[in-house]
């Protein structure tokens, strides 16, 4: 499970008869949240320095050399490290005084429409709040419907904490992950927010950077060549062997693992819980996934530490993002930030602030329910919408 996901900002306490381990996990998560604010600035600087250190690109996992020499890696264009450097610069340069933006809600909406219409380029930065707006929630009714049996047996109360749970065996652990993957990666979200966003920017010169790993931009029809998923993809496995710097598609495995648990397909072909509610919480041993290259174990391709595999596709997307930013350092650029939380601001939020401050023609627009703000230093170039993302997108289109 990737610690650096902005999706996982809110948790619900675990409860139930057999929830001792789950409660301990929740206590650790809650304790972490209590100390995040005071160490936020330190954390962002430390993470940035860690990502930008040269050895990250040549040595991983205790000194095991991976594909590509240090010289080869550092010669590659890397939008990820570029944007993190900009983020750190923004934190240092723009100060701590924040604003909710200038003007009434109506005035800001008028300015946003004008900025979108007149933009030479649009850079979309998307975090967990966008998928939440689309209905891909990790707790509540949706969780209870999909993971009711895991909740009853293990006391797990949301998908986030379930990703940390020390399940008793691989068969149970991968049964959990098959459900998590399927219902967040291989189905369309309940609300068409991503498709509405696509309609909003269709025909425009646009690029997307996102910390989300649910593949929803591509499902909605966004051009893969204009997408950079920085933190991985629920649809990919990677080997536990650090010498294998490849990723492996898991769609066929996921479908088999869902059927093996007793999920049934409805008239549209989507998996549903059977009417009798009888599901297995394990998959057969021969379905436990393994690396097709050497037979070793696999893990999710989600960024948690320096073992995360940045495969050829990731590097192409990173280079494309770097090229797009460099091609639009000046001119009328709209930096449209959607649902970016406080877990990974150095990847999207802070770089957007810094790039806006460097370009007097740029506009920074932040749409984020309860978390829309900007530095006072760029207040005149900023638009802040403290509302549901889907609602704002609908209003822009009116």
Tell me what each language-model feature is.
Residues 50-398:
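Conserved catalytic alpha/beta core of Sir2/sirtuin-type deacylases, generalized to analogous enzyme cores
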Residues 10-11, 18-21, 33, 43, ...:
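Short terminal hydrophobic/aromatic SLiMs and anchors at protein ends
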Residues 2, 12-13, 22, 31, ...:
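Ala/Thr-enriched low-complexity intrinsically disordered regions
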Residues 38-44, 49:
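N-terminal targeting/docking segments
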Residues 5-7:
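Polybasic, low-complexity intrinsically disordered segments
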């Amino acid at each position: 499970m990737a610690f650096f996901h902005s999706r996982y900002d809110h948790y619900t306490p675990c409860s139930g008869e057999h929830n001792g381990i789950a409660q301990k996990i929740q206590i650790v998560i809650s304790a972490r949240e209590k100390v995040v604010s005071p160490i936020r600035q330190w954390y962002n600087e430390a993470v940035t320095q860690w990502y930008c250190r040269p050895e990250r690109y040549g040595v991983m996992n205790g000194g095991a050399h991976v594909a590509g020499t240090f010289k080869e890696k550092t010669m590659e264009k890397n939008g990820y490290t570029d944007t993190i450097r900009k983020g750190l610069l923004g934190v240092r340069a723009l100060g701590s005084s924040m604003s909710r933006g200038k003007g009434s809600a109506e005035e800001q909406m008028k300015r946003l429409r004008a900025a979108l219409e007149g933009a030479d380029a649009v850079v979309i930065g998307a975090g967990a709040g966008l998928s939440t707006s689309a209905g891909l929630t990790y707790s509540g009714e949706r969780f209870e419907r999909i993971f009711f049996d895991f909740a009853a047996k293990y006391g797990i109360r949301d998908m986030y904490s379930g990703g940390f749970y020390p399940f008793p065996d691989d068969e149970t652990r991968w049964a959990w992950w098959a459900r998590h993957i399927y219902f967040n990666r291989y189905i369309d979200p309940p609300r068409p927010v991503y498709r509405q966003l696509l309609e909003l920017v269709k025909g425009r010169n646009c690029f997307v950077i996102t910390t989300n790993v649910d593949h929803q931009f591509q499902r909605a029809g966004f051009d893969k060549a204009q997408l950079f998923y920085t933190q991985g993809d629920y649809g990919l496995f990677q080997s536990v062997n650090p010498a294998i710097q490849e990723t492996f598609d898991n769609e066929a495995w996921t479908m088999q693992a869902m059927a093996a648990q007793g999920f049934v397909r409805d008239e549209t072909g989507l998996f549903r819980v059977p009417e009798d509610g009888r599901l297995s919480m394990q998959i057969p041993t021969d379905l436990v996934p393994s690396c097709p290259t050497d037979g070793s174990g696999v893990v999710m391709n989600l960024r948690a530490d320096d073992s995360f595999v940045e495969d050829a596709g990731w590097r192409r997307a990173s280079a494309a993002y770097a090229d797009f930013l460099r091609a639009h350092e000046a001119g009328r650029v709209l930096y449209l930030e959607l649902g970016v939380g406080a877990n990974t601001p150095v990847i999207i939020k802070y770089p957007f602030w810094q790039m806006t401050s460097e370009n007097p023609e740029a506009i920074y627009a932040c749409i984020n329910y309860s978390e829309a703000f900007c530095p006072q230093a760029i207040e005149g170039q900023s638009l802040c919408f403290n509302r549901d993302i889907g609602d704002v997108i609908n209003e822009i289109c009116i």
